[in-house]
Swiss-Prot record:
This is ATP synthase subunit delta. The gene is atpH. F-type ATPases have 2 components, F(1) - the catalytic core - and F(0) - the membrane proton channel. F(1) has five subunits: alpha(3), beta(3), gamma(1), delta(1), epsilon(1). F(0) has three main subunits: a(1), b(2) and c(10-14). The alpha and beta chains form an alternating ring which encloses part of the gamma chain. F(1) is attached to F(0) by a central stalk formed by the gamma and epsilon chains, while a peripheral stalk is formed by the delta and b chains. It comes from Legionella pneumophila (strain Corby). InterPro entries: ATP_synth_OSCP/delta_N_sf, ATPase_OSCP/d_CS, ATPase_OSCP/dsu. Belongs to the ATPase delta chain family. Keywords: ATP synthesis, Cell inner membrane, Cell membrane, CF(1), Hydrogen ion transport, Ion transport, Membrane, Transport. GO terms for molecular function: proton-transporting ATP synthase activity, rotational mechanism. It is found in: Cell inner membrane. F(1)F(0) ATP synthase produces ATP from ADP in the presence of a proton or sodium gradient. F-type ATPases consist of two structural domains, F(1) containing the extramembraneous catalytic core and F(0) containing the membrane proton channel, linked together by a central stalk and a peripheral stalk. During catalysis, ATP synthesis in the catalytic domain of F(1) is coupled via a rotary mechanism of the central stalk subunits to proton translocation.
Length: 180
């Protein structure tokens, strides 16, 4: 576990607990996504790293860039001030990622990586999503990528469950059994 994860975890947990209490999980996802994107821009990274920029300037810049909804949200403004004062703004992408893990656990959503030989049609994606939801007893969020080296089929990873339905995987198993 990296130091940044260890440092980001309490922030993410506190934000999650606040969002849960306020019943605003999706809104806070949007806020954190926007903040994480902003701090990763080269200009913002340079400005934040510049010792000549004050905490007040950094806070003002972030609130200005992020728009009017930030000006009306005291909790969000307090978060920005806290992260700025503690020199933790660059942890926002990590905080956002940890927040999303907490949110997925709360909403019983499991992110499933699907690597397919070819593009899946919307109907195939729907069937796959329904089948996995039923098998795993959770809602699933599919993250689909294409890999022609599979030769056909798909490779599915959901947490520590791996389903290798690829032609390449079957050929590897056949080769292993023939070699034994």
């Amino acid at each position: 576990m990296s130091d940044s994860t260890t440092i980001a975890r309490p922030y993410a947990k506190a934000i999650f607990e606040h969002a849960l209490a306020e019943k605003k999980l999706s809104e806070w996802s949007e806020y954190l996504t926007l903040l994480a994107q902003v701090v990763l821009t080269p200009q913002a990274t340079q400005f934040i790293a510049n010792p000549a920029s004050t905490d007040e300037q950094q806070i003002e810049l972030l609130i200005e860039i992020c728009g009017s909804k930030f000006k009306k949200n005291d909790a969000l403004n307090n978060l920005i001030k806290l992260l700025t004062t503690n020199k933790r703004l660059m942890l926002l992408p990590e905080i956002k990622a940890l927040y999303e893990v907490y949110r997925a656990e709360q909403e019983k959503i499991l992110e499933v990586d699907v690597v397919s030989y070819s593009e899946l049609t919307p109907a195939q994606q729907q069937r796959l999503s329904e089948s996995l939801s039923q098998r795993l007893s959770r809602k699933v969020s599919l993250k689909i990528s294409i890999d022609p080296s599979l030769l056909g089929g798909a490779l599915i990873r959901a947490g520590d469950l791996v389903i290798d339905g690829s032609v390449r995987g079957k050929l590897n198993m056949l080769g292993t059994s023939l070699a034994a």
